[in-house]
Regions:
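Conserved HGGG/HGGXW glycine-rich cap/lid loop of the alpha/beta-hydrolase fold
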Residues: 5-56
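Flexible "cap/lid" loop of the alpha/beta hydrolase fold
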Residues: 100-101, 106-136
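Conserved alpha/beta-hydrolase "acid-adjacent" motif
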Residues: 209-215
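Conserved alpha/beta-hydrolase catalytic His-Asp/Glu region
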Residues: 120-122, 139-194
Length: 266
């Protein structure tokens, strides 16, 4: 089972589950925990091969569905029937896959630095990465990707946070995660269609230039999706602008909880 950590107020308090991206760990949410645990039960998960979760869990043919199922196993272990899910970067794909395969377990999705389609630039970058992944030290590739995705000086803290976490991931694990990106665009397109019934908020840094255009397009087509740009922020907006990220996410969860509340009659 995946390594996890919980902060629980009471059984009646809504749960919020945090899912980090590839190369990260649950520690990337350090600027969210204090604020969220005030009024929410919090579940932090280390995805396979990351943080304190076991390595070598991969089987041939594993997909995002298998990874999302492992998160559901943690929910079962803790006794969480429903949860709001907050994902970051590639973790947003895991979050959306959970919503697709287990819609009754996901109250809402809050997707930061969301990846819903790779454009020609990111596809070319991934193609080069796949071609050299077994010959080039993975940290060199990861640093390169980090600088391309988070190029500005003001992104330095978030960039270094992800690079430092990635150092703890073995090369074989990195290669496995990297391989999941092959032929992923059709899968991502299907996810945007199949999860429209789940309330979804996209939180994107205004400087997340690689991934914003597809978000704008999908939000125009789906009235149930909401999209907010966070100023002075890049791809990892929960670290670049934590106060803004936290307020927007907490307000959204409160709105969903209010909609779901049962009002007694009489």
């Amino acid at each position: 089972m995946l390594h996890y950590r919980t902060y629980e107020i009471s059984p009646e308090t809504p749960w919020v589950t945090f899912i980090h991206g590839a190369g990260g760990s649950s520690s990337v949410w350090f600027k969210q925990i204090r604020e969220f645990r005030k009024k929410h039960n919090v579940l932090l998960v280390d995805l396979r091969g990351h943080g304190q979760s076991a390595r070598g869990m991969w089987k041939k043919g594993d997909t995002f569905a298998d990874i999302s199922r492992e998160v559901i196993e943690v929910l079962d272990e803790v006794g969480i029937k429903e949860t709001h899910v907050i994902g970051m970067s590639l973790g947003t794909i895991v979050a959306q896959t959970m919503a697709d395969n287990f819609p009754g377990r996901v109250k809402s999705l809050i997707l930061g630095g969301a990846i819903i389609r790779f454009d020609i630039r990111t596809k070319l970058l991934l193609l080069v990465g796949r071609a050299v992944k077994r010959f080039v030290p993975y940290m060199l590739l990861y640093r390169l990707f980090a600088y391309i995705i988070m190029p500005r000086k003001e992104h330095e803290e978030s960039r270094m946070a992800f690079v430092n976490e990635a150092k703890k991931v073995y090369q074989k694990e990195f290669i496995r995660w990297f391989s999941l990106t092959k032929l992923i665009n059709p899968y991502l397109t299907r996810l945007q269609i199949s999860t429209t019934a789940i309330p979804t908020l996209f939180l994107m840094g205004e400087e997340d230039y690689l991934f914003i255009p597809p978000i704008e397009e999908v939000v125009r087509k789906n009235k149930g999706f909401e999209f907010i740009k966070i100023e002075k922020s890049g791809h990892v907006c929960n670290i670049d602008q934590p106060e803004v990220f936290n307020k927007l996410a907490i307000d959204y969860i409160a709105k969903i909880e209010q909609k779901n509340a049962v009002i007694p009659i009489g």
